Amino acid sequence: MLTYPNIDPVAIHLGPLQVHWYGLMYLLAFLCAWGLASYRTKQRDGWTSDMVSDLVFYGALGVVLGGRIGYVLFYEFDKFLENPIWLFQVWTGGMSFHGGFLGVMIAMLFWCKKYQKTWFQTLDFIAPCVPTGLMLGRIGNFIGGELYGRAVTDPNYPFGMIFPTDPLHLVRHPSQIYQALCEGLLLFIILWWFSSKPRPRMAVSALFLMGYGVARFVMEFFRQPDADQGFILFGWMTKGQILTVPMLLIGLWMMWYAYQKKIYDWGPQKNS
């Protein structure tokens, strides 16, 4: 069994001001996205560092607003009905990937209109930069002792640990680390490699949807469902899995469509 490091969830103390690791990870995620996207401008015609800075700003707004609103609508709508002001109490925690994803999609529409880029040109460009942010977010969850995994059933399992925030004090899967490695690091490597060569428009975005969909669906088997949600469908599917299925199906269709149309935005096959 592993020992939980029990890191102080507050990274920086400045008098009454406290900066939590989870918030710091969001900042690092946006900085990583900016750095990676800036590097990608060297390989793509028609992209500049100013465009990337604006793109990351729009994306950050989409993540924060969409993530919070999505969490409230998907997971805590009853609490919102009881106290609508709770929506704005972001310091109490609660962000949804699926809500953040939708928020980014909407934000990208405004950015595309400003810079005269198509939606999928933009998504294909930025998609490989996203998994590092997902990885850092899950590390933030781990440090905060939240969203831990299900109880370990095998007493000889070497990677289980007891989280101080778990009222039952059971040996659990460190599912945040599993997700950081699969939805974050592994997906980043796959997308970065795939996008390093010219691909049809929509193909990179499609691979992101499929890759995240598969990784999240599998990781949900290790993650403890929210106490007020439990298993929603068939006695074993969680809310996270239900929300991920459409992403996977849309990604499959997009990949098929991309290779049917074969529209290239860069490289020797670029369409004029």
Curated annotation (Swiss-Prot):
Enzymatic class: transferase
A GO MF label: phosphatidylglycerol-prolipoprotein diacylglyceryl transferase activity
Pfam families attached to this UniProt entry: LGT
Signal peptide (residue range): none
Membrane-topology annotation of the record: Multi-pass membrane protein
Pathway where this protein functions: Protein modification; lipoprotein biosynthesis (diacylglyceryl transfer)
Entry keyword annotation includes Cell inner membrane: yes
Sequence intervals crossing the membrane: 17-37, 55-75, 90-110, 125-145, 174-194, 202-222, 230-250
PROSITE patterns assigned: LGT (PS01311)
Annotated GO CC locations: plasma membrane
One of the GO biological process terms: lipoprotein biosynthetic process
Keyword annotations of the record: Cell inner membrane, Cell membrane, Membrane, Transferase, Transmembrane, Transmembrane helix
EC number: 2.5.1.145
Positions with a binding annotation for a 1,2-diacyl-sn-glycero-3-phospho-(1'-sn-glycerol): R138
Keyword Transmembrane: yes
NCBIfam families for the chain: lgt (TIGR00544)
Protein name: Phosphatidylglycerol--prolipoprotein diacylglyceryl transferase
Organism: Acinetobacter baumannii (strain SDF)
Encoding gene per record: lgt
